[in-house]
Amino acid sequence: MSHYDQQYNAIIQKIIESGISDEEYQVRTKWDSDGTPAHTLSIMSEKMRFDNSEVPILTTKKVAWKTAIKELLWIWQLKSNDVQVLNDMGVHIWDQWRLEDGTIGAAYGYQLGKKNRTVNGQKVDQVDYLLHQLKHNPSSRRHLTMLWNPDDLDGMALTPCVYETQWYVKEGKLSLEVRARSNDMALGNPFNVFQYNVLQRMIAQVLGYELGEYIFNIGDCHIYTRHIDNLNIQMKREQYEAPKLWINPDIKNFYDFTIDDFKLIDYKHGDKLTFEVAV
């Protein structure tokens, strides 16, 4: 069984047993199918920690891992907010949040693409600054990226759930700590935990570092009420050994990665489970 499955099931069980309901409040989220309020059970401040001896991907259900990586490339490599660009990759997970101009506004990739840092007298964006600093100033305690920009929040189709990364270089190993203000455990968490670990592996490879720790912090950790039944089914399923992630070792530039440079080997998993989307 995988370490991720074990940590995931423990958090799900904790939410079901002791999570606090928000049904007494008006909520922003609505069910995509019928427009009624989408309520949750939630707990606060959970941490998932991995030593990177295995790839953190669920085995109790099938996770669309290529879709997760494509979304990662859209945000971190292309720094795009254009939903059509994602559609052209065959991915439609952001369609419900598409604004009239076809984008998700000033969210996610838009923030990473803003040239607000300076390297050698040239303005660069957060990703390029991070890559430069990790390579040339590894001992710094300032290796962060931030998607939560108060100046732009009102112009975002959806404020970022995963909003911050912090990177550490110790003894030649690259560690990553991720912070999510809010995480939907049925749909969001399996994608986010996997894709940010892929990001860590990509950056470690192009900069020549070994893998260190991977930590995923969650502020509001919740389950939507319509997801509880299927999550109970999922928790009872057999867990399998984690698969291996192959990343093309010939890629030495972060911007050269394509979806064809990733393979998930020996991914054994339970059947797909459907969870309704709340928007």
Curated annotation (Swiss-Prot):
It catalyses: dUMP + (6R)-5,10-methylene-5,6,7,8-tetrahydrofolate = 7,8-dihydrofolate + dTMP. The active site is at 161 (nucleophile). (6R)-5,10-methylene-5,6,7,8-tetrahydrofolate binds at residues 184, 278. It is found in: Cytoplasm. SUPFAM superfamilies: Thymidylate synthase/dCMP hydroxymethylase. Its main location: cytoplasm. One of its GO terms (cellular component) is cytosol. It comes from the Bacteria. GO terms for biological process: dTMP biosynthetic process; dTTP biosynthetic process; methylation. DUMP binds at residues 141-142, 181-184, 192, 222-224. Pathway: Pyrimidine metabolism; dTTP biosynthesis. Its EC number is 2.1.1.45. GO terms for molecular function: thymidylate synthase activity. Keywords: Cytoplasm, Methyltransferase, Nucleotide biosynthesis, Transferase. Disulfide bonds: none annotated. Belongs to the thymidylate synthase family. Bacterial-type ThyA subfamily. Homodimer. NCBIfam families: PRK01827.1-1, thym_sym. Catalyzes the reductive methylation of 2'-deoxyuridine-5'-monophosphate (dUMP) to 2'-deoxythymidine-5'-monophosphate (dTMP) while utilizing 5,10-methylenetetrahydrofolate (mTHF) as the methyl donor and reductant in the reaction, yielding dihydrofolate (DHF) as a by-product. This enzymatic reaction provides an intracellular de novo source of dTMP, an essential precursor for DNA biosynthesis. This is Thymidylate synthase. It comes from Bacillus licheniformis (strain ATCC 14580 / DSM 13 / JCM 2505 / CCUG 7422 / NBRC 12200 / NCIMB 9375 / NCTC 10341 / NRRL NRS-1264 / Gibson 46). The lineage of its organism: Bacteria, Bacillati, Bacillota, Bacilli, Bacillales.
